[in-house]
Amino acid sequence: MDNIEPPFSGNIHAETEVKKEEKKKMKKESVSLMGLFSAADNVDYFLMFLGGLGTCIHGGTLPLFFVFFGGMLDSLGKLSTDPNAISSRVSQNALYLVYLGLVNLVSAWIGVACWMQTGERQTARLRINYLKSILAKDITFFDTEARDSNFIFHISSDAILVQDAIGDKTGHVLRYLCQFIAGFVIGFLSVWQLTLLTLGVVPLIAIAGGGYAIVMSTISEKSEAAYADAGKVAEEVMSQVRTVYAFVGEEKAVKSYSNSLKKALKLSKRSGLAKGLGVGLTYSLLFCAWALLFWYASLLVRHGKTNGAKAFTTILNVIYSGFALGQAVPSLSAISKGRVAAANIFKMIGNNNLESSERLENGTTLQNVVGKIEFCGVSFAYPSRPNMVFENLSFTIHSGKTFAFVGPSGSGKSTIISMVQRFYEPRSGEILLDGNDIKNLKLKWLREQMGLVSQEPALFATTIASNILLGKEKANMDQIIEAAKAANADSFIKSLPNGYNTQVGEGGTQLSGGQKQRIAIARAVLRNPKILLLDEATSALDAESEKIVQQALDNVMEKRTTIVIAHRLSTIRNVDKIVVLRDGQVRETGSHSELISRGGDYATLVNCQDTEPQENLRSVMYESCRSQAGSYSSRRVFSSRRTSSFREDQEKTEKDSKGEDLISSSSMIWELIKLNAPEWLYALLGSIGAVLAGSQPALFSMGLAYVLTTFYSPFPSLIKREVDKVAIIFVGAGIVTAPIYILQHYFYTLMGERLTSRVRLSLFSAILSNEIGWFDLDENNTGSLTSILAADATLVRSAIADRLSTIVQNLSLTITALALAFFYSWRVAAVVTACFPLLIAASLTEQLFLKGFGGDYTRAYSRATSLAREAISNIRTVAAFSAEKQISEQFTCELSKPTKSALLRGHISGFGYGLSQCLAFCSYALGLWYISVLIKRNETNFEDSIKSFMVLLVTAYSVAETLALTPDIVKGTQALGSVFRVLHRETEIPPDQPNSRLVTHIKGDIEFRNVSFAYPTRPEIAIFKNLNLRVSAGKSLAVVGPSGSGKSTVIGLIMRFYDPSNGNLCIDGHDIKSVNLRSLRKKLALVQQEPALFSTSIHENIKYGNENASEAEIIEAAKAANAHEFISRMEEGYMTHVGDKGVQLSGGQKQRVAIARAVLKDPSVLLLDEATSALDTSAEKQVQEALDKLMKGRTTILVAHRLSTIRKADTIVVLHKGKVVEKGSHRELVSKSDGFYKKLTSLQEAV
């Protein structure tokens, strides 16, 4: 759009401000400019030619407009000399403007539509080729070269940068370059002297604006980093809110968050000062430049070198052409970023290893697969690690037999499966299938003979049926159902609302761990493989489901060669042969009974997993923290309580809904004003600056019009005197402009930042006052709450504080301009005001043009990006099932919708853009033609009509700028709703209830009296019905039962994460509802199955249990948890930073730090939820001994899955369907042959 914005319209700061550049995640290599378009085909070349032609013509229309505009002004100035002849000339020029507008319409339409379409087409092709190249790589690539690569960033963010460069931004550059060239050519042809002088002053304004942009970018980066630090604090606290509540860490969290916000607030003062100074200095230079140009133009006019209109429009032409070059800079920057981004994409596509892709199809196939596998002298080391995994390893797996591999962590069990699938090649030796080296076999065919079930199932964000279908592409629905039945999945699938068409969510998040595993088993079963590869396939199932699925797997394994990787030895007792690996060598082979009788490594492993073998108590993992695959976890504590897998959305509680209904927009604004009350003085001072700044453009336009009309005076001395006067006034205005803008921006920025900090801190405190049930709601997940804290709080500031500055400024401008316009010529003012909708539309579409019409690319491609992310993160599953082609086709399908919509969107955007500019040109023509009519009728004069016309042009663009803020204001108002929804909510479980009992000591008597409970997110599913349970002070109570029986819920209720719906939960005879919650939690210590650590040092994480603990006490706690030794071995010892959520520590190390934290708390009641699950056998024994000591004299509740951990408990209760079905000691319960507990121990029987 050729929006002809007046050279002083109050929004230069909007043009000169630049967005903060993204952090440089990409390498500095870039493709050539032509290389950027290397994905183009013939259709794209035609589109680019047509689009380039359109944008070039479009760029030349504005300079031509000024030629006709100047001709009309000159005719109007001379109208009194020959009214009829000159009026005809005005009409002719007006018609030329209309024709030029039509050219603008067509050229803009073609330019926008063609560039958008070709950008979409080329980038879609790049995305597809990039994903295909990644999927064609072998696993070695992902272990070595790809470790530091961010493929998803390249396929999403980098591709968007390339699309932006190829599409919108290339068109922008061509348009502005053509405008620049045409403008200066016309300028030199019109008044070359004035063009040279204008060319000299424009760079000064550009330098000032550029310097301001650089300073603001630097400050913004620092401010953004400060807010990012605060966001990290909030995200970490909310993602681990149960740990924060359990250790009464709310106050510490708020203090940490507040300290992070203070850093950002300090930067806001510099930001406001820099903005005010930058904008003010730019306008000051603009005033002075116009003063100089007026003076020189008057000199040329007086000496007959040019006329007033030509001088005036030449200045405008050259200034706008110079600014066009400046407007091209962001687009050139975007193209530069696109070239760098394209280099990352083309590097992958261009370097696509032919061997990696060809070997999928090259090689021989066997007519009949028997299934005999031989390792002959195989030596191997991972490409990413120099240590040898195997050295001269040899063994034979006979066809149709089941071989299980066991051994300690790092012995190479999973490596065997990887090498059989040919993920890796041996350094020496051979791997044979039916006597044929697998190197010589067609890789895709080889993998089609195998079915893999991994320990951690990988599902894709599509339907259950599609996930099973991955095992066999052309299978029918009956085959899918049969496979699901074999995996014990059919019954739960059919119970879902959409059955097999149920969407599983990204990564299968809508399914439980056991459900995901059964889908993965069904996928392998569907393949009907000759060779079955099972890597702890039943690890995620509860005991009852495990038994059924194991039976199904036993049936599937018949007559198939099967390799089983075993952690839980109960899963391999019936296999044909067990191979024990240690240090990369086969130490023992034989059946289960043979190996037990030998008393070797296998027997040792069995004994480590069963300290009371004569009672057949359990079968457990002897290595629960595998470095390759991560620790086994059957569930996350409490986290699955958020929703059932596929429940319908629950209505919000009546209280929340009622509270939200009461919050109207007006009341929210009023409440925000009250929240911002401490800054009323800042608002007043900022508003004074905004009013003064707003009045300047109108007065500036009056000065322009006055000088222009003065140029047509017949008296040279009058021209000199009046123009000199205006020039001096402009210089004076330039001097006072900087202080005015500093006043406006400094105080408004300070007001906004202080408001943001106050809103964020209030929000954070309010969030941490809510009960856990509130966090369980989908809308209150960590991501949503973090967004409210960051994005919504920023939107409130942006919409209310930042935008208020512009609104006040433009309101001042509008009032001033309308008053002046109607004062000088109400007729002209009425006609031009009637054209305001057209002028406003032109301005708004011009702003859209600068941003680009492509819309939110990230959102448009979200589904495709999600699919790519899943495929790449689960590359082993994709490779194992030879699903590269399926994934690529599905990815292409996901890209097709945004690609098709680009055509329609391009035409709509281009036509709307061109039409608005055409109508703007017609509006100018109408206004000037009408002035000629009025002058001819003697109803106005040239001077007054031009003043009215010029001042209203400024007003139109200020109104457009204000209207452009409407979406931001609407977003801000909506954000207020999110903010006050949290601030107004009253928690169901107050942490500091008035009149509650403060406890300084508790004995530890705990009693459940007729407790009924259902999770708030699933009120229709009762967890407990009249539960009665008691543990005496100082005694231990173990809670066992099948999945979903309510074991973890017992701990949740004791911690008062939730309240019973009926009945009472008492501690020391007092209902815990009457006890001050924070004082109660100080006497309780929780150790969860998955330890939650904070991103700080080990020392600080342990000290979280007791802020007043001494160094000696911290060390003693670590020793008690068997953590001191590994901590001391670290380079920085206790000051070692654990990383985000403890990623720098292994699972076992994290658990021991968590146990040390609980030890330091010295609690009266200890709550252990599988506290030793993440430890290896040796560490588990030591930590269990430490916990046994810690439990002495304390009331202890143990939630147990691994029954070995509870054999010493004073009392064991078995829960089933929310009720206590058995109670007694371990010996008492195992003596009941038909009891629930006995059945559980039998299911976990290892020997």
UniProtKB/Swiss-Prot annotation:
Record GO cellular component, one term: membrane
Assigned keywords, A-Z: ATP-binding, Glycoprotein, Membrane, Nucleotide-binding, Repeat, Transmembrane, Transmembrane helix, Transport
Binding site for ATP 2: G1041, P1042, S1043, G1044, S1045, G1046, K1047, S1048
SS bonds (residue pairs): none
Domain ABC transporter: 373-608, 1006-1242
Keyword set includes Transport: yes
GO MF annotations, alphabetized: ABC-type transporter activity; ATP binding; ATP hydrolysis activity
Residue intervals of the ABC transmembrane type-1 domain: 48-337, 679-971
Top-level taxon: Eukaryota
Coiled-coil regions listed: none
Membrane topology type: Multi-pass membrane protein
Similarity annotation: Belongs to the ABC transporter superfamily. ABCB family. Multidrug resistance exporter (TC 3.A.1.201) subfamily.
Protein name: ABC transporter B family member 14
Residues bound to ATP 1: G407, P408, S409, G410, S411, G412, K413, S414
Ranges that cross the membrane: 49-69, 95-115, 172-192, 196-216, 277-297, 315-335, 680-700, 727-747, 807-824, 830-850, 915-935, 949-969
Sites carrying sugar chains: N362, N392, N780, N938, N1010, N1108
